[in-house]
Amino acid sequence: MEEKIGKVILDTTCYPGKDLYSDGAIEDEMLAISRDFAPEEFNRVISERKSWPILYHFSHIRENILSWIPFTGEEKVLEIGSGCGAVTGALCERAKEVTCIELSMKRSKINAYRHQDQDNLKILVGNFQEIEKNLTEKYDYITLIGVFEYGESYIRSENPYVDFLRIISKHLKPDGKIILAIENRLGLKYWAGCTEDHFGTLFEGIQGYPKTKGVKTFSRKEFNGILEEAGNLKADWYYPYPDYKFPMTIHSDRHLPASGELHMRDYNFDRLRLDLFQESQVYNTLLSNDLYPQFANSFLLVIGKEQPQTAPVYVKFSNERDQKLSIYTEISEAADGQLTVKKVPSQKKAAAHVRNLGTICEELTGMYKEEKIEVNRCRLKGDCAQLEYLTGITLEDKLDHLLEEGRTEELEKLFFSYIQKVKNIHEKNHFEKTPEFVRQDCNGAF
């Protein structure tokens, strides 16, 4: 049987007739939100309701986990465990066809209502094992975002997690890939005082789940064993920060964080936490000892039968702001090893902002030339602004080094010499307050 919500098809052939799991009354509230509010209003609703489930299921930041994946627009995607559709919209915007599998009818309807204008979305409602028997399509991508840890619930077997990947792999095209996001069982946040995400207790995962069953996350070593046992699968490893739920930066083995880069700590939106030590300092120690991949809070894997070699090696999002200015920065590696930097609009409304970066670059080049400060060259390529990938010591690094060594006089001299150069440039250029500047309550003294 099929029914439609807007343009979205819900196939209920394998639906058992009632939802076998639910978060209770909050799901009724979320269904009403998805039905009664446009996606553009979700952030306002999140702000007003002040509810963890509403933030978790409706925040656009959730899409950051895969919105940067280099889709061509011709892909067929299978999303397993689509829930309320936190990342479904990002897939629909980038792929040709999206098929979701979700056990809960209510969550499927939430997904359908919020994406009812998408004509390339079909939701199969029911148990994965029942639906999987009837899948005949081969997919370019299969996604498991916050799903793999529930493998014991999806697959009834002696080795459910290995079998889960084996079964999924059968539905990939020869060059197809699995996108899998999951918490790291040994993530630093758990040592620092955050509770285990699924059970809400301290140290449950890092002690090996001695008191709980049904959900399980893995260390990197454990996951490599699962990949090998599932058919010697290969993976590109990424590390969403602060975690995969609300990632603002995504590093990889080919582009790990720099010292001092990991400093966020206020990301436990769902529960209180302990502060047992300063995470930023411990991260620096882990980085200097090549241990960060073992203790990253979350993993994002792009898995294939052959090594995927996904082009982007680093992504940083700047999309907690007006949609007209919402972008992300991507560093990609070509087959010859050459690195390039791109500024990419996160929303269609931000395309004009990215195009304007080329004009800004030209203007700054002229302004800074007299002070012998070179501006990173920028050129427009499609909807993106492409910049050079430069290596070297930044002014910030130099100042930090001088501070660590107690060379404060040199630090002050270097810092204020740069400040003077900037002042010399801008004293020649009158700052004009535009109407937009005044509207944003930025009418201070300059």
Task: Name each region found by the language model.
Residues 179-202:
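Conserved class I S-adenosyl-L-methionine
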Residues 292-298, 308-337:
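ATP-binding glycine-rich phosphate-binding loop
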Residues 325-357:
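ATP-binding glycine-rich loop module of kinase domains
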